[in-house]
């Protein structure tokens, strides 16, 4: 990923002004006015870009912060998958808060305005966030694959998840050190270097032309092509297992011998309002587990698909530029500039898309988001608490739901029947 690299100064900018000390004041004032009018001041389409960046900035920061708060303040949401989702949100907050504003200014001015130190830091943090995101998504896919295919071989726990997250944050900064080492800030117009930071670029400097080809080829394979290929295979197997047949551990004999709760109660001489027998309750629990796993798998597949689509343009453009040497001499410079600018925006749009995906595909996250917004915005209902309900209130709610289920046994019977059609092939 290369959001901070600049394609170069725009056409029409003077290529030299001689000795800066000999420039007449009236010429300098005219030249600065020209820079503001024709170079710095955003054009119409750039105002659209600014609005798009601002929207992504707000949605990404607010949405990912709410994701972290929802898991932190609710013990029932502290699952292994949600730990990894929080880690992904932290990486998104990092890249949005630190790197997005710099990328916006670079795309608008086509100049690096932040000096030599940040020229190394900001691209480095962007590369680290990419590595963290890819490794986190890979660990999620691996965890889900083991949970579906080998539930007894590997027991996933919160402690192991936290250890994996620490490992991700230890490995990612280490492997991305070369990105910081090769970044250098230089001026396209050296005669203006002491007077303005305009026309400065933050780009890679390699000792040999072969090195960037090797580095960016490996970067593309390790951070995009290989992990996405492995994750696609894992989710394909998960999809086939969950939607094609019963998950491991489902009791086929229980399904074959299952009788409706009302029939079992009548055989035992009990009324229709009695509690369902253990066998029916076990079957309902398996149906509930199946549905929960399907919902989680569907949400994670969408997250992976959106990540792949958002990072595809910048990954391909970087390979074409760094490995094959394209875009150095081009007649349609504006089209190249537009492609790079849009691909930069897509990278940050992925950070804003994840909380939206959680909202639409996860009922628990949706409840927490609604509770948070109801505290801040009027008209959204009573202000709910982000905390999990107390055990007493949960027990009371469970008792009421049991009474309601007993009083409407026919409805419960219909729910179980529809559940059977979901599980049976």
From Swiss-Prot:
BP GO annotations: cellular response to hormone stimulus; feeding behavior; neuropeptide signaling pathway; regulation of cytosolic calcium ion concentration
Domain notes: The N-terminal region is required for orexin signaling.
Signal peptide: none
Function: Moderately selective excitatory receptor for orexin-A and, with a lower affinity, for orexin-B neuropeptide. Triggers an increase in cytoplasmic Ca(2+) levels in response to orexin-A binding.
Site for Important for responses to orexin, residues: 36
Annotated disulfide bonds: 119-202
Species of the source: Sus scrofa (Pig)
GO cellular component terms attached to this protein's record: plasma membrane
Sequence ranges on the Cytoplasmic membrane side: 68-82, 141-160, 236-298, 361-425
Database matches in Pfam families: 7tm_1
Protein name: Orexin/Hypocretin receptor type 1
Region of interest (Required for response to orexin-A), ranges: 26-41
One GO MF term: G protein-coupled receptor activity
Family matches, as InterPro entries: GPCR_Rhodpsn, GPCR_Rhodpsn_7TM, Orexin_rcpt, OX1R
Name of encoding gene: HCRTR1
Membrane topology: Multi-pass membrane protein
Subcellular location: Cell membrane
Extracellular compartment segments: 1-46, 106-119, 183-213, 322-336
Family: Belongs to the G-protein coupled receptor 1 family.
Keywords annotated in UniProt: Cell membrane, Disulfide bond, G-protein coupled receptor, Membrane, Receptor, Transducer, Transmembrane, Transmembrane helix
Top-level taxon of the source organism: Eukaryota
Transmembrane segments: 47-67, 83-105, 120-140, 161-182, 214-235, 299-321, 337-360
Tagged with keyword Transmembrane: yes
